[in-house]
């Protein structure tokens, strides 16, 4: 039921990601992992939540694992993200499976994917991604 709601909102409201939890529904139109970083930073309890997202690579998958979501649908799921979801027992579905997630200009691997390429621990990934986003000027304090 929650999965259907999350997918429906993602498709019909032009959101980039949607999370349905016991606390309610969180939505965002921000790009990349920024909304996930903000929700984690807010202290929201998202354990057991269901999520729908436009693009999920290794970085986003590690953040979803860190949040404790139980199920995820991605319109585009990177193979690295799929491995993380499997490793953390997160039920998932996708529209398209991509070999890799590239940067916005399509010229290289996404910098967030690079930041977590050798990381498998979600808490460590959160710290590395927070540092990378600060470095790039994408996240304030």
Predicted regions and their residues:
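C-terminal binding/interaction regions
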Residues: 67-70, 82-141
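Short, polar loop motifs at secondary-structure junctions
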Residues: 76-80
């Amino acid at each position: 039921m929650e999965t259907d709601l999350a997918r429906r909102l993602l498709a019909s409201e032009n959101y980039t990601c949607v999370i349905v939890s016991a606390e309610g529904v969180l939505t965002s139109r921000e790009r990349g992992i920024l909304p996930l970083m903000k929700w984690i930073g807010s202290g929201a309890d998202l354990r057991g939540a269901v999520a729908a997202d436009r693009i999920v690579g290794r970085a986003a998958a590690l953040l979803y694992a860190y949040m404790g979501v139980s199920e995820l649908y991605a319109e585009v799921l990177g193979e690295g993200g799929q491995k993380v979801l499997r490793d953390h027992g997160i039920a998932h579905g996708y529209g398209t499976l991509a070999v890799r997630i590239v940067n916005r200009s399509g010229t290289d691997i996404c910098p967030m994917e690079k930041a977590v390429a050798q990381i498998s621990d979600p808490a460590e990934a959160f710290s590395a991604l927070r540092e990378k986003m600060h470095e790039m000027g994408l996240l304030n304090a």
